[in-house]
Swiss-Prot record:
<feature type="transmembrane region" description="Helical">
    <location>
        <begin position="212"/>
        <end position="234"/>
    </location>
</feature>
<feature type="transmembrane region" description="Helical">
    <location>
        <begin position="262"/>
        <end position="282"/>
    </location>
</feature>
<feature type="compositionally biased region" description="Acidic residues">
    <location>
        <begin position="925"/>
        <end position="939"/>
    </location>
</feature>
<protein>
    <recommendedName>
        <fullName>UPF0182 protein CE0802</fullName>
    </recommendedName>
</protein>
<dbReference type="Pfam" id="PF03699">
    <property type="entry name" value="UPF0182"/>
</dbReference>
<feature type="transmembrane region" description="Helical">
    <location>
        <begin position="63"/>
        <end position="83"/>
    </location>
</feature>
<keyword id="KW-0472">Membrane</keyword>
<comment type="similarity">
    <text>Belongs to the UPF0182 family.</text>
</comment>
<feature type="transmembrane region" description="Helical">
    <location>
        <begin position="290"/>
        <end position="310"/>
    </location>
</feature>
<feature type="transmembrane region" description="Helical">
    <location>
        <begin position="115"/>
        <end position="135"/>
    </location>
</feature>
<feature type="compositionally biased region" description="Low complexity">
    <location>
        <begin position="940"/>
        <end position="950"/>
    </location>
</feature>
<feature type="region of interest" description="Disordered">
    <location>
        <begin position="920"/>
        <end position="950"/>
    </location>
</feature>
<dbReference type="GO" id="GO:0005576">
    <property type="term" value="C:extracellular region"/>
</dbReference>
<keyword id="KW-1003">Cell membrane</keyword>
<feature type="transmembrane region" description="Helical">
    <location>
        <begin position="176"/>
        <end position="196"/>
    </location>
</feature>
<feature type="transmembrane region" description="Helical">
    <location>
        <begin position="19"/>
        <end position="39"/>
    </location>
</feature>
<dbReference type="InterPro" id="IPR005372">
    <property type="entry name" value="UPF0182"/>
</dbReference>
C-alpha cells in the first residue's frame, strides 16, 4: 500500500580522487604536449641552421619577462587582496540579516586563504603571458642606438622615439592596468566583506564605507593618478605621430592647444592624486570627488573644447599659412624615414623638354638592344610545359628576373628553379613513402634571355616560334658537357642542381612540406632521374635516427609512419621549414621579409636571395603607410601571392640581404645598411648573427636586386613627397600617382601597375644597367608626369633617379598609350579574328625613357590555343608606341621601324631558328610594313602590294574559315594547319588593302 511519502534524494557521489587526478593529468598533457613538442623540435631546427643563439636569446628573454610580469602582477593582486582582508570590519551588526553580505560572509571567510592564493596566481600567469610578448620592446631598449637626427619640436633624438618611448609606454600601461585590477579587487572585496555598504532609501539605510576600505581605495586611486601624470607627459611625444587630414605630426592646433592641455592636465592630475591621498586622513570624500570633477571638466574644456575652437576659428580660415611650418617638418621627416632624401634621390627636372630625334633614340643602344620580349608574369605555363620534365616538378606562378653577361654585354634573363611541386603529385605518388622519402627535391636552374625567342611566330595557329630559348643547368645537361657550354659561359653552371629548399616545395596544401632523407641501408631511394636514385648527403636536416626525435616529429606532424616505417633509419634526417622566407624570418624574427625570393647561381650553387627590412611603427612627423596596401598591385593580386604582414610602418630600411642555399638550407644574413640604427640595435641583441657587408662576395653582389616591395613603398611616398614647398604640398597641385595597370585582366585594371626589372641605359652614364622602373602620372590625370628608376648595379646600388617631365608639355601616359595601341585598326582586326580560337594576353607595358628625351612604350602580345590542356603562351606580336605612332609586328625590329626608329640596335636581339642557327630579323622587312599613326606627319614608306586582289583575299579567307570549321573534329595537327592557312589568308587580304 502506497504511503505517499517521497524517498529522500540520494547524494551525488563524487568521483574518486584517482579519477579526478587522471582527468586533470590528461587535460594538462593535451595542453602542454603540443607546446613542448613545438619547443623541442624548434630547438633542434635552430641547432641545424646554427642559429641556436637566436632561439636561446628569445626564449630566455621571454622567460625573464614572464617571471617579472607574473611576479609583479601576482604581487600587486596579492597585496590588494591582503589589505582587503586585513582591513575588513569585524562587526556586521549594522547589516541587515537578509542582506547577501551577511548571509555569505561566513562562507567567504572560510575561503579567504584559498582566494588569496588562487586569484594572484591566475592574474600573475595572465600578466606573465601578456608581458612576455613585449620581448622585442625590452631588447631594443636595452640595446638602443642614437639616430643622430632630432625631432623638430622637442629636440629629442629619434632613438628616443624608436627605443625608449615604447619601453616607457609599456611600463606606464602595465602599472595602470595593475592598479585598475587592484582597485577592482579592493572594491569588490570590501563590499563582500562588509567594508562597503550601499544605501537603501526604502529601508532608510545609509551608505557606509569603513576607514580601511576608504584608505585602501584612496591610495590605489592616488597611485593610478600619479601613473596618469606620467602618461600625460608621454602623450606629449605622441602628438608628433598624430594623423592629421593633410599630413602626419603635430600641427598648429596640437602645438598651441593640445600640448599645453597635456601640461595643464598633468598639474590637475597631481592635485587629484593629493586629494585622494588626503582621503586617508579625512572622512570627507567630497574633496577627492571634487578633484575628479575638476579633472573631468578640465579634460573636456582644455583637452577638447579649446582645441576645437582654435581649429575652427583660427586654423581653418588660414590653414595653409598656419600649417606651413608643420607640413615642412612632415616632408623632411618622411623623406628620411623612407630613404628618399635629396642625398638618395636625384631629380632630373624638365627631362625631355628638348625632345630627342629618331636618330638619337636609335642610338640609345643600351635600352633599344635590351627591350624585353619575355614577360615573367605570363610565361610560367610555358616554362612548365617545356621544362617541367616530370609532373611532380613545377615553377612558381610568377617567374623572376635577373641579369647575366652575354658576350660582354649585360642582358636580363627570366630565371626559375625547377622545384618539386607537392601539389602536383598524382595517385600513388601521394603515398606517404613516395611523397616524403622518394619525391624529395627539384632539379636544376632554368634561364631564358628576355630579349630572345626561338623563332619568329608570324601565324597565330603555328606550333612553332615565339618561345623562350632556355639555358639549363640540371642533372641531365650537366651529364652532357657539350650541352652545358651556354651555362658555363653565362656563369650559371650549377655544381649541385638538386633543390631541397624553395617556396614551391614548401607550398603543400596540407602544410606538410617535410622530406625524410639519408641512408637507410637499402641504397638510394630518392628520385633523381629516370635511371638514377639519390641519397641526400648535405648538412641540412635534423637527425631523427633515435626514437625520441622520431616520436617528437611524429607528434608534430601527427604521422605514425615516422615511427613505424623502415624508410626511417639511424642515419635519417628530416628537412622541414623549407620556404626560404620562413627560414629567414625564424632566424631573424625582427626582420620583415620581401614578398618575393628569387634564385641565383652563386659560386656554382643555387641560392635563394631574400631581402630583409628593418621597420619601426612610427617616427616623429613621418607619414605611416600600410605595407600591404603599398605593395598591392595587379600582379600580386593575379598571382595570389602571400602579401606582407598587414602592418603600418613609419620607417623602413633594406638593411639585410639573406641567402638560403637551395641544397642544404644554410641561411646567411649580410648587413646591407651599416648606418641603420635599428639594425645596430638588433645586432646588439643578437651578436654575430648578421655578417658585415664586406663578407658579401662579388658574385653574390652581382645578383642582388633593388627590392621590389621597398621600391613600391618608396614610389608611393615619392608620389607626394617629391614636393618640397609646403604651400604646394597643401594644395596637392603637384602630386603624382602610380598609374593603374591597363594590361591587367578584366576586373583588375583598377589595380596599380607593378614596377618592372629591365636592363636599360643608366641615367648618368648611358651604359647598360639593371634597373627597377615605374612611371608616374599626374594626380587624377592620365598624362605622364615622371619616371622613377632604382639601380641594382653593384657600383651604384640603390641610387634612385626621377626624371620629371616638363609641366608645359603633354606626354601620353600608360593608359593612353595602351588605348592607342589597342584601338589601332590592324590590332583590333587581328584580335577580333584571333580571339575566336585563342586566348590573348597583354604582356608587361614597359615605359622606357630613350634618347635622352623621349618615351617609348613596349608591350608584347602572347597567344595560347583555347580548349587545349597542353597549350601554353607564346610571343605572337610586339606593340610599340612612340610620338603618337603605333608599331605592330611579329618582331621588335619591325615594330620599331614602323614608328620611325632605325632598328639597327635591336638587331642584337637574336632569334634562334629551328635548325639551331642564330639569325637576326630582316630589318628591310620593316620597311614593308605600314605604321599606324596618330597625328604624325612622319610615317614609313608604304609597302608593296602583295599578289591577289581584295575580292580574291575575301574568298581566300572564307575558304580558310570553312576548312577551319571542318578541321575542328580532326587532329590537333590538322586544326593547326587550318589555322595557319587562315592566318596567311588574312595577311594576304590585309596586304592587298594596304596597297590599295
Amino acid at each position: 500500500m502506497a504511503t505517499g511519502l517521497t524517498p529522500p534524494p540520494q547524494p551525488i557521489k563524487r568521483p574518486p580522487k584517482a579519477v579526478t587526478w587522471i582527468i586533470g593529468i590528461i587535460a594538462l598533457l593535451v595542453l602542454v604536449t603540443p607546446l613542448t613538442v613545438g619547443f623541442y623540435t624548434d630547438w633542434l631546427w635552430f641547432g641545424e641552421v646554427d642559429y641556436r643563439g637566436v632561439f636561446s636569446t628569445v626564449i630566455v628573454t621571454r622567460i625573464i619577462l614572464f617571471i617579472v610580469f607574473a611576479l609583479l602582477a601576482g604581487f600587486v593582486t596579492w597585496l590588494a587582496g591582503y589589505f582587503t582582508i586585513r582591513l575588513r570590519p569585524d562587526d556586521l551588526t549594522a547589516f541587515d540579516a537578509e542582506s547577501p553580505v551577511f548571509q555569505y560572509r561566513q562562507m567567504i571567510e572560510n575561503s579567504l586563504r584559498r582566494i588569496l592564493i588562487i586569484v594572484p596566481i591566475f592574474v600573475g600567469l595572465l600578466g606573465g603571458l601578456v608581458g612576455q610578448r613585449s620581448w622585442q620592446t625590452v631588447q631594443l631598449f636595452l640595446n638602443r642606438e642614437p639616430f643622430g637626427v632630432e625631432d623638430q619640436q622637442f629636440g629629442m633624438d629619434y632613438g628616443f622615439y624608436a627605443f625608449t618611448l615604447p619601453m616607457l609606454r609599456l611600463i606606464t600601461s602595465s602599472l595602470s592596468t595593475l592598479l585598475v585590477v587592484a582597485f577592482i579587487i579592493a572594491l569588490v572585496g570590501h563590499y563582500l566583506l562588509g567594508g562597503i555598504r550601499p544605501g537603501n532609501q526604502m529601508t532608510g539605510q545609509k551608505a557606509f564605507i569603513s576607514r580601511g576600505a576608504r584608505a585602501q581605495l584612496a591610495v590605489t586611486a592616488g597611485l593610478w593618478m600619479l601613473v596618469r601624470v606620467a602618461t600625460y607627459w608621454l602623450e606629449r611625444y605622441d602628438l608628433l605621430t598624430r594623423e592629421n587630414a593633410t599630413f602626419t605630426g603635430a600641427g598648429y592646433t596640437d602645438i598651441n592647444a593640445h600640448l599645453p592641455a597635456k601640461i595643464i592636465l598633468m598639474v590637475i592630475s597631481i592635485i587629484v592624486a593629493v586629494a585622494f591621498f588626503s582621503a586617508i586622513f579625512l572622512r570627507d570624500l567630497r574633496i577627492p570627488g571634487l578633484a575628479v570633477v575638476l579633472l573631468v571638466l578640465s579634460s573636456v574644456v582644455v583637452g577638447a573644447v579649446w582645441p576645437l575652437m582654435l581649429e575652427r576659428f583660427s586654423v581653418q580660415p588660414n590653414r595653409a599659412e598656419k600649417e606651413s611650418e608643420y607640413i615642412s617638418r612632415n616632408i623632411e621627416s618622411t623623406r628620411f624615414a623612407y630613404g628618399i632624401t635629396d642625398d638618395e634621390v636625384t631629380y632630373i627636372e624638365n627631362w625631355g623638354a628638348g625632345g630627342a630625334t629618331n636618330a638619337e633614340v636609335a642610338a640609345d643602344e643600351a635600352t633599344i638592344s635590351n627591350i624585353r620580349l619575355l614577360d615573367p608574369q605570363i610565361l610560367s605555363p610555358t616554362f612548365t610545359q617545356q621544362q617541367q620534365l616530370r609532373n611532380f616538378y613545377g615553377f612558381p606562378e610568377q617567374l623572376a628576373m635577373d641579369r647575366y653577361e652575354v658576350d660582354g654585354e649585360l642582358r636580363d634573363f627570366v630565371v626559375a628553379a625547377r622545384e618539386l611541386d607537392p601539389n602536383s603529385l598524382q595517385q600513388n605518388q601521394q603515398d606517404w613513402i613516395n611523397r616524403h622519402t622518394v619525391y624529395t627535391h627539384g632539379n636544376g636552374f632554368i634561364a631564358a634571355q628576355a630579349n630572345q625567342v626561338d623563332e619568329v611566330a608570324r601565324d597565330v595557329g603555328s606550333t612553332r616560334g615565339g618561345y623562350p630559348v632556355y639555358t639549363v643547368s640540371d642533372l641531365q645537361t650537366n651529364a652532357r658537357a657539350a650541352e652545358s657550354e651556354d651555362a658555363e659561359e653565362l656563369g650559371i653552371m650549377v655544381e649541385q642542381p638538386r633543390i631541397y629548399y624553395g617556396p614551391l616545395i614548401a607550398s603543400a596544401a596540407d602544410g606538410k612540406d617535410y622530406a625524410i632523407v639519408g641512408d637507410t641501408g637499402d641504397g638510394p631511394v630518392e628520385y633523381d632521374t629516370d635511371s638514377t636514385s639519390y641519397t641526400y648527403d648535405g648538412e641540412g636536416g635534423v637527425g631523427i635516427g633515435n626514437l625520441f626525435n622520431r616520436a617528437a616529429f611524429a607528434l608534430r606532424y601527427q604521422e605514425m609512419n615516422m615511427i613505424l616505417s623502415d624508410r626511417v633509419g639511424s642515419e635519417s634526417k628530416i628537412l622541414f621549414e623549407r620556404d626560404p622566407r620562413t627560414r629567414v624570418e625564424k632566424v631573424a624574427p625582427w626582420l620583415t621579409t620581401d614578398s618575393k625570393s628569387y634564385p641565383a647561381v652563386i659560386d656554382g650553387s643555387i641560392k635563394w636571395i631574400v631581402d630583409g627590412y628593418t621597420t619601426l611603427s612610427s617616427l616623429p612627423y613621418a607619414t605611416r603607410t600600410s605595407l600591404t596596401e603599398a605593395t598591392l598591385d595587379s600582379v600580386v593580386v593575379d598571382n595570389f601571392q602571400q602579401p606582407l604582414l598587414t602592418e603600418e610602418v613609419g620607417y623602413i630600411r633594406n638593411s639585410v640581404k639573406a641567402v638560403v642555399d637551395a641544397y642544404d638550407g644554410t641561411v646567411e644574413l649580410y648587413e646591407f645598411d651599416s648606418e641603420d640604427p635599428v639594425l645596430k640595435a638588433w645586432r646588439g641583441v643578437f651578436p654575430d648573427v648578421v655578417q658585415p657587408e664586406s663578407e658579401i662576395s662579388n658574385e653574390l653582389r652581382d645578383h642582388l636586386r633593388y627590392p621590389e616591395d621597398m621600391f613600391k613603398v618608396q614610389r608611393e611616398m615619392l608620389s607626394r613627397y617629391h614636393v618640397e614647398d609646403a604651400g604646394t604640398f597643401f594644395t596637392n597641385d603637384a602630386f603624382w600617382s602610380v598609374p593603374n595597370d591597363p594590361t591587367a585582366p578584366e576586373g583588375r585594371q583598377e589595380m596599380k601597375q607593378p614596377p618592372y626589372y629591365v636592363v636599360a641605359a643608366d641615367p648618368d652614364t648611358g651604359e647598360s644597367s639593371f634597373q627597377l622602373i615605374t612611371p608616374f602620372r599626374g594626380l587624377q590625370r592620365e598624362f605622364l608626369s615622371a619616371h622613377m628608376t632604382a639601380s641594382s648595379d653593384p657600383d651604384n646600388f640603390g641610387k634612385i633617379t626621377v626624371r620629371v617631365l616638363p609641366t608645359g608639355a603633354v606626354t601620353q601616359g600608360p593608359k593612353q598609350a595602351q588605348d592607342a595601341m589597342m584601338s589601332s585598326d590592324q590590332v583590333a582586326q587581328d584580335q577580333t579574328l584571333w580571339r575566336g580560337s585563342n586566348d590573348l594576353f597583354n604582356g608587361n607595358l614597359l615605359t622606357l625613357p630613350v634618347g635622352g628625351g623621349e618615351i617609348l612604350y613596349v608591350e608584347p602580345i602572347y597567344s595560347q590555343r583555347r580548349d587545349q590542356e597542353s597549350a601554353f603562351p607564346k610571343l605572337l606580336r610586339m606593340l610599340v608606341f612612340y610620338k603618337g605612332q603605333v608599331g605592330y609586328a611579329p618582331t621588335i625590329a619591325e615594330a620599331l621601324s614602323q614608328v620611325g626608329i632605325d632598328p639597327a640596335a635591336a638587331q642584337d636581339i637574336e632569334v634562334v631558328e629551328e635548325d639551331g642557327t642564330v639569325t637576326v630579323p630582316d630589318v628591310n622587312a620593316t620597311e614593308d610594313a605600314d605604321a599606324t599613326t596618330d597625328g604624325e606627319d612622319e610615317t614609313p614608306a608604304a609597302p608593296a602590294a602583295p599578289a591577289g586582289s581584295e575580292a580574291e583575299g575575301i574568298e581566300a579567307i572564307n575558304e580558310a574559315l570553312r576548312n577551319l570549321e571542318a578541321a575542328r573534329d580532326g587532329s590537333f595537327e590538322e586544326y593547326g594547319r587550318a589555322l595557319d592557312a587562315l592566318d596567311r589568308a588574312v595577311e594576304s587580304y590585309q596586304g592587298a588593302g594596304t596597297a590599295e
